[in-house]
């Protein structure tokens, strides 16, 4: 049975708005004349959710309405959509490079409605493990199944709360801690506490052998500044009142943990034998020709993109 926006899937209202928002952004990118990424499944999630807000974002109608009333605010929205597209492309390229280098197990922590296991061209014998809240995975897999989608890699879903003992669930699902792994941490860290972030990377490190790769969207010091958060919240409020199609837009910053003392991800990894490099979101968007207008430079999210590889001389007990 095909799912349409006129028949929302049972339980769709429980799927995190953040996951649906990112799917809508990928659907919008897929519609572009020269898309950075093509995700033929993103629109399926938008339709299955049956929420006009995300349908309007995916179709471009929300942006067009905003542009007619406030072009500068529309440019902010377009930068946000461009950031999600660039982020998706970054992780796509990373994970395919890891697979081409011989890594045969991929773990996505907080996978949301990502569809890499379905839409990327994988080498033989790659297994993709996705860890996410049970309701999100149930919605995703049911929507894909009802639309005849099949994974392009060996796929294993691991329904789990990442605040709990997820390593045990991952290993019980077939993960091999003795084999090199490509780890993906995309769009997750703002929702974790300072302690939970350290625990997450501690568990990743314990489960990694030399030759493992990791990519993470990390938070710069600017990301957590009260002025940065206040500016983003103000823009979301303006979008709500400027465009009727965006009236239901949730303020994702209210879900972030803004406590001080968060570890620098790259430094944390380097201290445990990983060779890490960092790319700012501004440079990432420039790489893919999606930079914000000069006069709206602060519209680019102050994220950091960390890539790392675990060296042979690393102590796994560090």
Curated annotation (Swiss-Prot):
What GO MF annotations does this protein's record show?
Answer: methyltransferase activity
Instruction: Specify the superkingdom.
Output: Bacteria
- Tell me which Gene Ontology terms the entry assigns under biological process: methylation
Q: Does the keyword S-adenosyl-L-methionine apply?
A: yes
The EC class name is transferase
Q: Where does this protein have coiled-coil stretches?
A: none
The EC code for this enzyme is: 2.1.1.-
Q: Does the keyword RNA-binding apply?
A: no
Q: Which Pfam families match?
A: LCM
Chain positions recorded as S-adenosyl-L-methionine binding sites: 132, 161-162
Do you know which InterPro entries this protein is assigned to?
Ppm1/Ppm2/Tcmp, SAM-dependent_MTases_sf, SAM_mthyl_Trfase_ML2640-like
Q: Which Gene3D superfamilies match?
A: Vaccinia Virus protein VP39
Can you tell me which family this protein belongs to? Belongs to the UPF0677 family.
Function (record text):
Exhibits S-adenosyl-L-methionine-dependent methyltransferase activity.
Q: This chain belongs to which protein, by name?
A: Putative S-adenosyl-L-methionine-dependent methyltransferase MMAR_1595
* Species annotation: Mycobacterium marinum (strain ATCC BAA-535 / M)
Taxon lineage: Bacteria, Bacillati, Actinomycetota, Actinomycetes, Mycobacteriales
């Amino acid at each position: 049975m095909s799912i349409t926006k006129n028949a929302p899937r049972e339980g769709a209202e429980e799927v995190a708005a953040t996951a649906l928002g990112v799917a809508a952004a990928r659907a919008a990118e897929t519609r572009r004349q020269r898309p950075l990424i093509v995700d033929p499944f993103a629109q399926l999630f938008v339709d299955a959710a049956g929420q006009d807000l995300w349908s309007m974002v995916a179709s471009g109608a929300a942006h067009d309405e905003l542009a007619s009333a406030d072009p500068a605010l529309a440019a902010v929205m377009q930068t946000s959509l461009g950031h999600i597209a660039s982020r998706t492309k970054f992780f796509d390229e990373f994970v395919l490079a890891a697979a081409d280098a011989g890594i045969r197990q991929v773990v996505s922590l907080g996978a949301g409605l990502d569809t890499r296991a379905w839409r990327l061209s994988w080498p033989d014998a790659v297994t993709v493990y996705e860890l996410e809240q049970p309701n999100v995975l149930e919605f995703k897999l049911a929507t894909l199944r009802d639309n005849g989608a099949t994974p392009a890699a060996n796929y294993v879903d691991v329904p789990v709360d990442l605040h709990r003992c997820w390593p045990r669930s991952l290993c019980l699902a077939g993960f091999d801690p003795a084999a090199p792994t490509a780890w993906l941490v995309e769009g997750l860290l703002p929702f974790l506490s300072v302690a939970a972030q350290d625990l997450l990377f501690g568990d990743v490190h314990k489960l990694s052998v030399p030759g493992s790769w990791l990519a993470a969207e990390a938070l710069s010091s600017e990301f957590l500044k009260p002025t940065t958060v206040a500016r983003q919240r103000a823009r979301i409020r303006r979008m709500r009142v400027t465009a009727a199609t965006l009236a239901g837009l949730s303020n994702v910053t209210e879900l972030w943990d803004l406590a001080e003392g968060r570890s620098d991800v790259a430094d944390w990894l380097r201290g445990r034998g990983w060779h890490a490099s960092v790319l700012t979101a501004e440079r990432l968007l420039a790489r893919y020709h999606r930079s914000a207008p000069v006069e709206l430079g602060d519209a680019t999210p102050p994220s950091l993109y960390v890539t790392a590889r675990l060296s042979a001389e690393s102590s796994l007990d560090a």
